[in-house]
Amino acid sequence: MTVRIAIDAMGGDLGPRATVLGSLQALSMHPDLEIQMYGPREALEDELETLPKRLSGYRSRLVLHDAPRVISQAMRVASALREAEGSSMLGALSGVREGRAQACVSAGNTGALMALGRRELGTISGISRPAISTAVPTQDGGRCYLLDLGANVDVQTRHLVDFARMGAVMARVVDEVAVPRVALLNIGVEANKGVPSVRDADRCLREDASRRIGDGTFDYIGYLEGDGIFSGAADVVVCDGFVGNAVLKASEGLATMLLTRLQETFEAHLTTRMVRAMARPALLRLKRRLDPVRYNGASLLGLAGIAVKSHGGADAKGFAYAVSRAVREIDMDLPAHLARALSDEGAAKPSTHSAAAVGGRVDSGLASDARPDDSHPQR
């Protein structure tokens, strides 16, 4: 079965230089994939002319759509909504809405993508604020879903509860975790720690659990501190978008620094170069495990269609990973699973134990709707 994905080719720091090459790399990885690419036709054709010969054969599965306007990274959400007509981002989302594609991938302005996604695709019933989620590696070889990553920098209790429910469905559907362990990110595990919205969300999740002991769809384990994200103590970690984005960016920076320093250390002297040659297979495995590029692509959970956000600074390889994430979500029919699960629940149905024991106007939720200095605080 052919899988069709709409690409906003003009998003991201590198623009079509990364998105065009990354899209062709994705086509080489997925033989059933067809890409609908939106952007200024002349610019896209120029990039296609520079493709390596090994990728030129995949152009037959790439369809160009002329979309001359670009939504910049600095554009505020309200401006993007007003000026979206003719843009590559709106074109890609419209392709999903009109059935020409099954998913959209963009490296563009996150706030604009979320707001336009809500307008064009709608949201799943019962979800007022979609959230951005991605998986991060854990030391036990597994993955942990972190959300929100920047779509909602100012959240209420009910939004955090919704994020917990959506993250649990993501872990069940994508990673086949039977009963995902869900935690709230906090500055301590004590009951009195954290801001009011986090404490209230903790209370709501615990009260829900006490009413539904034995029929849980996820296991609420309470508060988790930052170091627990990578320990494997939880399958889903929930926080507001400001905190989540800061955690993700700091983690990416740390991973990049560690890999760079490790390589520099092994290259410093002849003896270590010899050791490096012998240790090369293990080093490559470590790099593959920690390289942030491999985890590129964040899901906009809660939309009624599939939209994947690529990191703005991603290169072609990273963008290809984001496209692959969209392919997987199509295969899993993720929005339908979310809609069914949340409809069946009506409200969350977690079981619970302590984390300490295991170790008009589209309201985007963004501060950029109110303060121009925060116009793009997210990925």
From Swiss-Prot:
Gene3D superfamilies: Isopropylmalate Dehydrogenase
Signal sequence residues: none
Subcellular location field: Cytoplasm
Major localization class: cytoplasm
Pathway: Lipid metabolism; phospholipid metabolism
Biased composition (Basic and acidic residues): 370-379
GO cellular component, one term: cytoplasm
EC number: 2.3.1.274
GO process terms (BP): fatty acid biosynthetic process; phospholipid biosynthetic process
Keywords, ordered alphabetically: Cytoplasm, Lipid biosynthesis, Lipid metabolism, Phospholipid biosynthesis, Phospholipid metabolism, Transferase
Catalytic activity: a fatty acyl-[ACP] + phosphate = an acyl phosphate + holo-[ACP]
Renumbered residue ranges of the record's region Disordered: 344-379
GO molecular function, one term: phosphate:acyl-[acyl carrier protein] acyltransferase activity
Superkingdom of origin organism: Bacteria
Subunit structure: Homodimer. Probably interacts with PlsY.
Similarity comment text for this entry: Belongs to the PlsX family.
Function: Catalyzes the reversible formation of acyl-phosphate (acyl-PO(4)) from acyl-[acyl-carrier-protein] (acyl-ACP). This enzyme utilizes acyl-ACP as fatty acyl donor, but not acyl-CoA.
PANTHER family to which the protein is assigned, alphabetical: FATTY ACID/PHOSPHOLIPID SYNTHESIS PROTEIN PLSX, PHOSPHATE ACYLTRANSFERASE
Annotated protein name in UniProt: Phosphate acyltransferase
Annotated organism of origin: Chromohalobacter salexigens (strain ATCC BAA-138 / DSM 3043 / CIP 106854 / NCIMB 13768 / 1H11)
Classification lineage: Bacteria, Pseudomonadati, Pseudomonadota, Gammaproteobacteria, Oceanospirillales
